Amino acid sequence: MTILKTKELKIIQRLAKVKKSIQAVSYEYSRFDAIDNKNIYEIKCREKFYDKVLIEFDKYSFNLIYAQTFNKNFLYVVEMDKIYIFNISKLYMFDYNFNWEWKDLPNQTEFNKKEKIKKLVGYIDISQAIYEINK
């Protein structure tokens, strides 16, 4: 039983056309949304287009170490005007500058929680996408 939101599940279904073995994770507290034999996937849906997508350091660091430990790639999938796929493992390997900074952001974006906390975040230029899928 997966607890992913409908939008994330639709993105996984779209990715399954290219990544045949992709599966949504079913563990409620997983720090990533999908997995296959070579990759783990963190999926984000954004209402607006950004030329630099935001990634939270806690997701970045955990998923990067998890991927390295289990010999996988960490792919960050962001839906905006298109679906953009970033290989975070490769960006790390090539010393990509994420321009990490502390920002006041909502504690959770779901459930309309307005409380803000400081989060360490970085940015990925969309030119770094390894793959794009039209909506």
Language model regions located:
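Acidic-basic catalytic patches of nuclease active cores, encompassing PD-(D/E)XK
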Residues: M1-E28, I83
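Catalytic cores of nucleic-acid endonucleases
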Residues: T2, S21-A24, C45-Y92
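A short linear-motif detector with a strong N-terminal bias
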Residues: R14, K52-E56, N99
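Short glycine/proline-enriched coil/turn segments at helix->beta-strand junctions
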Residues: K17-K20, D36-N39, F70-K72
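Non-catalytic C-terminal interaction segments of nucleic acid-processing enzymes
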Residues: K20-S26, E79-K135
